[in-house]
Amino acid sequence: MTDAQQHRSILARVGEVLLIVGVLDIGVMIYCIMKGISYVSSFNIFAVWLGILLMRGSLWAASVVRFFSAFFLASGIGLIAIFPFLQPISLTLAEVRHISPFTVVLPLLLLPLSFWTARELNREPVLGALQASGKSVSPLVFPVLLGFGLVAAVGGVVAFT
């Protein structure tokens, strides 16, 4: 398989997964609305749109998804690490009793998805295609630091106010 075929198959595979996850997220959102359950997600329509673009071989979409996958992974891990320090544990336990399981489970499932997506889009055939198209390919250090930095900044503001 040539590099062109390899990068297109990687983009298609990642696109299919994002499309499926986006459609499932939209389905969960509709279910929660119909049942009056609280549910917040802004992942759904973007996952569908970027999934379709990736399936069509868009290197722009690959670059965007690569960046935001690393950002979401870092900020998600950072949030899990800092969350116990943001409010008393008794308040957290009281809130857990009244939230939908979707509110906890789906964000936790997005962490491994973000890891897998960033890893797939950071493979050599994709990076080579991005470079060949003239797009700058930077290491994922910046989105990772940005994700951790955002969580640290918000956590600092919440903790000291």
Which residues make up each language-model segment?
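Topology signature of small-to-medium multi-pass alpha-helical membrane proteins
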Residues: M1-T161
